[in-house]
Amino acid sequence: MAYKDSYLWRLRQAVGSDLVLMPGAMVAVQREDQRVLLTKRADDGTWCLPAGAAEPGGSFARTAIDELAEETGIEVSERDLIPFGCLSEAEAHTIHYPSGDVTHCFALLFLARAWRGDPVPDGDESTETRFVSLGEAPDPLHPPTAHALDLLSSYLGSGAFQVH
């Protein structure tokens, strides 16, 4: 869904650029060689995990599935989404957009090891896709993604759900 068709856009029409609290999801698509898919954001040129805000009536899983498909063309089923963490602390996940909008996001983080399709940037939100090793993420890295990749690394080492 295009941003101008989204719930967040409609909310922004009412509140302007003021701080908005927003639930959402991020997805770490991981290949067998352990590399994770990142996309390059069209708005600020940073690299990030596919992610987005929830729509009314949607779930965290539905948000993850929809955002992954919209931003990369990759399809994943709900049964293949593994929740591995939650990113909610304000200093880790408050985003200041180039437009002046400010959003404190609360994201459930998912790992996907099974999916269909090849990643293709949508040209609207993302301009490039790349699989990278966890220790070699490209610069500049979107700050919430840096935290999410740290949580993923901890999850992969411990198997325990991660919270930040």
Language-model segments: residues:
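Conserved Nudix-box catalytic region and its N-terminal flanking loop in Nudix hydrolases
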Residues: R31-E71, E75
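Short, well-ordered beta-strand micro-motif
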Residues: V29, L109-R113, R130
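Nudix hydrolase/Nudix homology domain
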Residues: G45-T46, G117-H164
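Residue-level detector of high-confidence beta-strand sites
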Residues: T39, F84-C86, D122
